[in-house]
Amino acid sequence: MMEIREMLVDPSKYGIKCPSKMTPKYITFHNTANDAPAENEIRYMIGNNNEVSFHVAVDDKEVVQGIPFDRNAWHCGDGNGTGNRQSIGVEICYSKSGGSRYYKAEDNAAIVIAQLMKQFCIPIENVVPHQHWSGKYCPHRMLDEGRIPSFIERIKQAYEGEEDMNRTLQLEDWQWKQLFDNMGKAWNAGKFSDWNWMVKIENRCLTVDELAWLNNHILASSL
């Protein structure tokens, strides 16, 4: 797992950089087409006054976030389409001539994308390159080297390679329904207050670890 360091845009610039609330349903990956590190990419993006924006930048050492995940960003070139309105933008650094640093940034990006998939219940089918939305030749280096399929495969491996406690529950349809009904009763009884837990159950992406924590929380609230 990679820590995502926040360096968020000032709310006074929301109208320019991220004007709309968003529930992420896709993840879009890009190449930066330069050789700056993640912090520099984010610092420049949040500091200027043009509309171009993205959520995170990933380099060989870290992941830096500039736009909140619950707000849209202008990174897909599809106007008010699904890419700009419903996808998290991930910029992969050092793609111009970064050598081994670039490939390490790619590895890190696969890990963080897998994390975001799990966090927001996004299926692998909804993880796409920038080119998917507007036809732009991006991520340029992956396209040049014909490696988008292998990058998607690395994301799958990162997603599936987590420890058992971080794996999504494997339940039958009736079991998911029963879990939703039972947790709904606990929520109505005030045993927990965050409805996002119910959303995760409804979307069938609750992990073993999360269920254990939730059960312990409900038990403790009954003492």
State where each predicted segment sits.
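Extracytoplasmic/periplasmic, Sec-exported soluble proteins
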Residues: 19-21, 48, 82, 97-108, ...
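Short, solvent-exposed alpha-helical surface patches in non-cytosolic proteins
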Residues: 163-223
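Basic/polar, cationic surfaces and motifs that engage anionic cell-wall
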Residues: 1-21, 25, 93-166
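N-terminal catalytic cores of peptidoglycan-degrading enzymes
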Residues: 1-83
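Structured segments of extracytoplasmic/periplasmic soluble domains
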Residues: 35, 44-48, 69, 112-120, ...
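Short coil-to-beta-strand
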Residues: 81-91
